[in-house]
Amino acid sequence: MDAAIRGNDVIFVLKTIGVPSACRQNEDPRFVEAFKCDELERYIDNNPECTLFESLRDEEAYSIVRIFMDVDLDACLDEIDYLTAIQDFIIEVSNCVARFAFTECGAIHENVIKSMRSNFSLTKSTNRDKTSFHIIFLDTYTTMDTLIAMKRTLLELSRSSENPLTRSIDTAVYRRKTTLRVVGTRKNPNCDTIHVMQPPHDNIEDYLFTYVDMNNNSYYFSLQRRLEDLVPDKLWEPGFISFEDAIKRVSKIFINSIINFNDLDENNFTTVPLVIDYVTPCALCKKRSHKHPHQLSLENGAIRIYKTGNPHSCKVKIVPLDGNKLFNIAQRILDTNSVLLTERGDHIVWINNSWKFNSEEPLITKLILSIRHQLPKEYSSELLCPRKRKTVEANIRDMLVDSVETDTYPDKLPFKNGVLDLVDGMFYSGDDAKKYTCTVSTGFKFDDTKFVEDSPEMEELMNIINDIQPLTDENKKNRELYEKTLSSCLCGATKGCLTFFFGETATGKSTTKRLLKSAIGDLFVETGQTILTDVLDKGPNPFIANMHLKRSVFCSELPDFACSGSKKIRSDNIKKLTEPCVIGRPCFSNKINNRNHATIIIDTNYKPVFDRIDNALMRRIAVVRFRTHFSQPSGREAAENNDAYDKVKLLDEGLDGKIQNNRYRFAFLYLLVKWYKKYHIPIMKLYPTPEEIPDFAFYLKIGTLLVSSSVKHIPLMTDLSKKGYILYDNVVTLPLTTFQQKISKYFNSRLFGHDIESFINRHKKFANVSDEYLQYIFIEDISSP
């Protein structure tokens, strides 16, 4: 070390507290002076009431100092307690400084401890009401930058220690242009208490921290990195709330005004002491005022308000700055596209390889916890606090403004662990499946080891299906519609018609239903007859609400329409149930629009009866007949003589149990996918079979007999008038009585009388009170010569 560095015997002192910076820099003799040690001692002897404060003359040019500490305890310890406390104090602070010197300065731990414990001086305050002293470690040298960097370490030591002296260390002295009262001098002219020397040290240089006289016993260390490198250029991080908002919070805490409030900025707020105008007692501890100012520090994402001097003489207040940090966490989670807002206002969450609604359980909270380890370290620790997690969750909900359209992949079948492509048979999982935002799924995991064609379950299943719908020439059309209907339940798109499963009891309708439910899980829902017989959009309708996004709806056990009082199927309902959107809300909810993707299957033992029949209705009805009866041995003979059955098979008593245990789940799913590829690629095809409905017979036939009259028929009026037609208002019409006579040639009035009367009542018009007519022409009347 350079000789100039090893020694300094010129002591620079301030003559009062609060010397202006300009006077200090210009070394105005009214405020500052420099002394040799003997000169300083004579000056104090000659001026016993003087106030002198030791300081570095020019920190940039020379900043080597002895390690020193200022301890100020607002209590008087007796001699025994003091000796015990001072001994522990020396051990604690030497260990603390040695650890810091080893970590940040590369010093030898043992050498630092040895130099500090072997040689130090202690002053003693003449104030009998408190325990106050300055301690100078005479052979342990460092730089002012090092002491400033050590400030936080010593502050943490003072907080954690149980030693009253250690807890009373004033860390505020470790700052730029710091000062320490010279031994034997007053704090101000009106204060008669001073610090005095104690044996064995009776030379003034032993009590000066800027006096440097290195020898063989001395030990010097300094920061390996500059203080500027340890402290960030900008204290205020982007993740914090705005600095202005934070300082306003600080101001509200004090209640009393902060005189130098406008002097605080992002770069200096930790170094500028707060000057408080104590109009009222301190808001933190209720004391009338404080001798030392409060100061701010920045730790762990929060502003810490503490008092300089003895920091324990006032409460410490923490102001969290994590508002924007929690907002940034929410933004980062949103950037993963793992939380979306649906068009119905629901939140869906991508968790465990599938999209799920956030309604039944707090899935957003679970997502936040599961995604925590993917976030930067400074963010992940914040999410361990339940309060902050709730804040992040609220931020996520508030930030989700734009809704997304979901469930727009009709050829994708969602599972708990991924998505099955019905077209190419590929199964997507993880991020590959994430892009298919399907909010409902089967509710079970796809297992490709069971999704195979060659298996004992498949062999058993095929026998069951072939018993229910035999592969015969007579049943070929029926079997094809059966396969089309069931495989269409995989498709997530609106179906053009409803299918009736019509047959007597014990013909396999319920078995088919249970197989389908096992294969598609939660995409299947069973509902009641009310969706067919009651007004749909009148009040809450949980039956319709439960259909939202389901792919199969089974309506079981229609009433016997021959019974008096039974409601007929409303044709308006049939039309509405084939629309993409069905109106119906759950109880206590305003969600009325339900997306209709379901294949609606009506399981009935009785032929359906409709309140009104027209072409629109007939285009929306398909019928699959079930004519194989499954009987117990005791009833087999009677069943074989029943014309309603084509075949009679023995009932397998254990079949229901196997289906409920999902034995045939993946076998039937494989079969459905196979049928889907056969019938519904490239487009889904499901055609009506109105000819299978007895009530439709009249309307199907009459459509081949009549056409509506128009102006193009007027030139034919010469021939038509001979057949009973008349011209009324330039329209060819047929009088009601003539129409009844002509129609009776095609329909038996005893069988179709009600249908004929309904048709007439719907289409007849009045020429006057007594004359009625229809604007129809029989096709044979205009096609025959």
From Swiss-Prot:
Main subcellular location of this protein, as a coarse class:
host cell
Looking up InterPro entries in the UniProt record yields: DNA_primase/NTPase_C, Helicase_SF3_DNA-vir, P-loop_NTPase, Phage/plasmid_primase_P4_C, Viral_Helicase-Primase_Cplx
Keywords on record: ATP-binding, Helicase, Host cytoplasm, Hydrolase, Nucleotide-binding
Q: What's its EC? A: 3.6.4.-
**PANTHER family under this entry?**
ATP BINDING PROTEIN-RELATED (PTHR35372), SF3 HELICASE DOMAIN-CONTAINING PROTEIN (PTHR35372:SF2)
User: How does it associate, per the subunit comment?
Assistant: Homomultimer; hexamer. Interacts with OPG148.
Q: What is this protein called?
A: Uncoating factor OPG117
What species is this protein from?
A: Monkeypox virus
